[in-house]
Amino acid sequence: MAYSFTEKKRIRKDFGKLPNILEVPYLLATQIDSYRQFLQEERAAESREDVGLHGAFRSVFPITSHSGTAALEYVSYRIGDPGFDVKECQSRGLTYAAPLRMLVRLVIYDKDGQSVKDIKEQEVYMGELPLMTRNGTFVINGTERVIVSQLHRSPGVFFDHDKGKTHSSGKLLFSARVIPYRGSWLDFEFDPKDNIYVRIDRRRKLPATILLRALGFDTQQILDLFFDKNAFHFRDDGSVVLDLVPERLRGETAAFDIKANGQVLVEAGRRVTARHIRELGKAGVDTLEVPAEYLEGKIVAHDVVDTGTGEIICEANTELTAELVQAIQDAGVKQLDTLFVNDLDRGPYMSQTLAIDPTRTQLEALVEIYRMMRPGEPPTKEAAENLFQNLFFSPDRYDLSPVGRMKFNLRVGRDEVTGPGVLDNDDILAVLRELINIRNGDGQVDDIDHLGNRRVRCVGEMAENVFRVGLVRVERAVRERLSLAESEGLMPQELINAKPVAAAIKEFFGSSQLSQFMDQNNPLSEVTHKRRVSALGPGGLTRERAGFEVRDVHPTHYGRVCPIETPEGPNIGLINSLATYARTNRYGFLETPYRRVENGVVTDKVDYLSAIEEARYVIAQANARVGEDGRLMDELISIRHGNEFGMATPDKVQYMDVSPKQIVSVAASLVPFLEHDDANRALMGSNMQRQAVPTLRADKPLVGTGMERAVARDSGVIVTAERGGVVEQVDAGRIVVRVNDDETEAGEPGVDIYNLVKYLRSNQNTCMNQKPLVRPGDVVARGDALADGPSTDMGELALGQNMLVAFMPWNGYNFEDSILISERVVKEDRYTTIHIEELTCVARDTKLGTEEITADIPNVSESALNRLDEAGIVHIGAEVKAGDILVGKVTPKGETQLTPEEKLLRAIFGEKASDVKDTSLRVPTGMDGKVIDVQVFTRDGVEKDSRALAIEQAELAAIRKDLRDQERIFEDDAFSRLERALVGQVAEGGPSGLARGAEVTADYLANLDRKRWFEIRMRDEEANRQLEAVRAQLEAQRDSLERHFEEKKGKITAGDDLAPGVVKMVKVYLAVRRRLQPGDKMAGRHGNKGVISMIVPEEDMPFTEDGEPVDVVLSPLGVPSRMNVGQVLETHLGWAARGLGKRIGEMLEQHTKMQELRAFLDQVYNASGQKVDLDSLDDEEIKGLAFNLREGVPMATPVFDGAQEPEIKNMLELAGLPESGQATLYDGRTGEAFDRPVTIGYMYMLKLNHLVDDKVHARSTGPYSLVTQQPLGGKAQFGGQRFGEMEVWALEAYGAAYTLQEMLTVKSDDVAGRTKMYKNIVDGDHRMEAGMPESFNVLVKEIRSLGINIELEQD
């Protein structure tokens, strides 16, 4: 296998046994592809598909005026260039968006509406459309946001029952529901009496036959559609004969003897069985004489008419009585059809429903539906018809969508998967038929938690829906104005007001429940957030109403949704994560890849199957044993079929899993030995990895899973080479790569400049910083890592640090999961993190004048101002602590009445001091740090201060430097190509005495000024043409760079677009260094979390035989009850990894022969698991590899395919460590050995973003609640601690009366008392006078608000 430039430097030993069939796909593809399809930017206007923006425009346009004389048609749209790039939008607090312009055509017809009178085309601006960044996020108002995908119930038809909960008898009441993509829901349901009702939009129920009547069916047609008939013939001799279909007698009790050929087959009172039916069939009985009483209770299928008089004896759907049977016989009716119903599998449901249906005609039915939908409005024929037509049959109001139509047709048993988006009569009849079949016991209800019935709605689709809503609002306004278009000669621009569209989009991206502030703690949390699937949100579930079934793991989640990663708490199971290989198909259903198996042989063909398709196949697991020839080896294999787990022989198997990690999500696949952890702890482990804070120096995990590189690569935090080439220049801030000739296109600069991100603030205030990995002269290929980002180490995800841990008690300090840490860890800054705080100071226009940012602040000492420059803004690099001034600002004060003395003082000492007050930006309490950046934004038309100009100059210089480098490398490249073309060619003449006919030499060119090269005239015309071409290229390149510079300069020097009333805004960024301290939360990757209880001096920590003190002491009681044994295995393997690293380090120090080093590395890498081709590396590369392995050989143990116990023992043995994984430890304080060997090794520990510094808080004096006058609560409000009921009881129990009085009065809500107290303290009189608490007044007012007067009478 070929290793990339960075992989070669440190190869991870992989214990995986299974072949890597499918690479881990691009992890952000779901988001990026969805939005790309929404925009269809790269496609030509005529070849765009009917989805996304194009689909939304097509569905709303053309808009025709009420009179029909004018129409506005949609032609195409185009998306412009964004005004600012992503970084500029983030720093200026803008939305990264591009203008959307739509080309429309206004067509005006003659009065007859046939011939075209006038056509006008014009481009109309439709507002700004947010664009997705390269990493799948949106920048909205300067902050990065993610639109989370939604898992919602797919449109289509669903059959269900109430699980026997509605009726006390526990009878199952079946129902059907037609859910459209947009429009009214249609429900059919049975009641306990087996009548069928219909509901529209969950309103009052009506008998279902009313809907059928409204569709135009009469009683006769309804009965014909839903029932088979039994024909009875009346003979002249008075006997009655039934046309017998033997099958219909099954399960009935014979009311009379059934005879065949004179023989009694079934005696009266006996139940007819399948054997009887077979005998009847054999005997060829097709008629059966029945007594007249047999007809009683049967239901008539048609109107029965007296042929003589034309009088209707009984109507269709009438139950026959003895009298009616007699009347029919008397009228001489020859044949009577009745409905075939029974209690077994042909219920009379439709007939019963017709009996309770009060309507008789179509109009009555329409009026009934109108009354139900619009209660209180008087119905008219037109209104009722319109309403009904618009409910399910109008494309504007109702759309099943292609998904809904596909699901609908498949569910009602049709083969065709396409069709119209609206319902028709056949659809409604098909739903009713299926519902009746299910009630009759023929058919299954649906499982709504099956992933074949839930689909994923991604960003693009949600944006399209919102856009369509905006367009529909525009449509209403345009239709009104279209009638004026002709008379007033309006242009399309004047007809369309795009505000509703812009507002809808802004609302969706800014404040939708699914548009979330991106979790940017570390690269993993970013990737996971973008791969999240939520069942909440508009059109989804709500936390309160979601039951257990929806939240539970379903068999169809296999390979689609992770069964482990979901939040704890009220959202458990409602917010899920996509599995590693999962993707959505064109209908939005999740699918997962499988390898095809043909005749027991596993192939490398991969098919993606959705949950519905998967149920049809027999699928083996990824770890099924496969021979060299690809045959499945075991006689019985563990398989899945139809959502059930079972066993099967190899010849039955049709598919096989692609990889064992396909069932879990990215975060869960980063947990080594996941298969040895309890599910609950695995859930905590995968969730806590997302909260890890990037440390100062990232440290790769010694024990990983092999997914680290993929996550780091796809998260976008590392810099990867876009094209291969040679590294030209590297410094801390940028990397310049000269691109390979074969990867550059003609005329473009063969240079890529990568500007690195330096100390940027993330959404969670963690620090984002990139560091170069390459050196000048390195040869890199496309996709190689050039620079590490936060929490990455050599292109691998590195969330924490490898710690030497011992599982043992230590003086009770690791009681209840507490963690004991060595001082060495703090000394070496292993867990020191940098947090960046953004503080903003805004100068506004006030009624009394403009606020001013200045260093001239009244009543402030010199020393407090010594960190500010002349503009009043703090210097970069200044170390500041709580209360220090960062930006000096003064606000005008209102004029006050002055005493004569004050007037005199002001006259003498000048105005300034007293008419302004100090409102400077100060460092908040509990914060200190270093100023790392300052940004100044000035409103257009306001003069910039010296600091703003200095910042501008620095930015322009950086851009100019980049462009100069680009120009220099481009020139070098062009002249080196020219040199190759000219040297050795014959010249016609040239500068510096180049004679005609002389040969151009390299020395001649080297001594000639490059600008004069173009004066050389060559004999070969091709060479002359090349000279001209290069000259033109260089000029074009210079012009383009100059234009680029001017464009950037324009943006930087222009005034800023600030909020109304804001004149100037200064943002100061503080870097706060947080060291590890007691109270910080730490965790491993197996859900083993705890809080640091104590930092122990290095010399007091337990140490090993060779004198190495451990870093962390964990409680051994944290393992058995939690059942996360993975942490112990990780510890063992980590110890082996570190031991092997030490041995390699010793070999390097002793300058061991290369052959021996290679042999040892071969033992390490190729003893088991995936093989590493060390022969492909040369000696220098092997040396570099060994050098990087000194700290430990990184291992990968993939989930469900990881290192086994013998392999771990083998590694420990190779490292020269005890196979038990335990060692004797000595007490650092006494030097004595502990009684028993202790489990010791290296575990990867994370520091989580729950830092004690952010939580500890104490109030001195602060704000009070307005009504109750009690102190506020919480750190954000600088609030106090609540002294509650139980605390009061405690003081009462001790009889501490004065303390209690103080707590309930002056320290809380006694307004007069607390001001008096302050005055007393100032006067040096430490007495307290308690007054009336404000809560008493609140109680009085509340009682008065109930209309009861209550007064306090004071003596």
UniProtKB/Swiss-Prot annotation:
Its EC number(s): 2.7.7.6
GO BP: any one term: DNA-templated transcription
Any one annotated GO CC term: DNA-directed RNA polymerase complex
Reaction equation(s) it catalyzes: RNA(n) + a ribonucleoside 5'-triphosphate = RNA(n+1) + diphosphate
Gene Ontology MF annotations: DNA binding; DNA-directed RNA polymerase activity; ribonucleoside binding
Pfam family, one: RNA_pol_Rpb2_2
Enzyme class, broadest EC rank: transferase
Tagged with keyword Kinase: no
Keyword line: DNA-directed RNA polymerase, Nucleotidyltransferase, Transcription, Transferase
Family matches, as CDD domains: RNA_pol_B_RPB2
Keyword Nucleotide-binding: no
Similarity comment: Belongs to the RNA polymerase beta chain family.
Entry function: DNA-dependent RNA polymerase catalyzes the transcription of DNA into RNA using the four ribonucleoside triphosphates as substrates.
PANTHER family: DNA-DIRECTED RNA POLYMERASE I SUBUNIT 2
Oligomer status and interactors: The RNAP catalytic core consists of 2 alpha, 1 beta, 1 beta' and 1 omega subunit. When a sigma factor is associated with the core the holoenzyme is formed, which can initiate transcription.
Protein name (record): DNA-directed RNA polymerase subunit beta
Species this chain originates from: Alkalilimnicola ehrlichii (strain ATCC BAA-1101 / DSM 17681 / MLHE-1)
Source taxonomy: Bacteria, Pseudomonadati, Pseudomonadota, Gammaproteobacteria, Chromatiales
Encoding gene, per UniProt annotation: rpoB
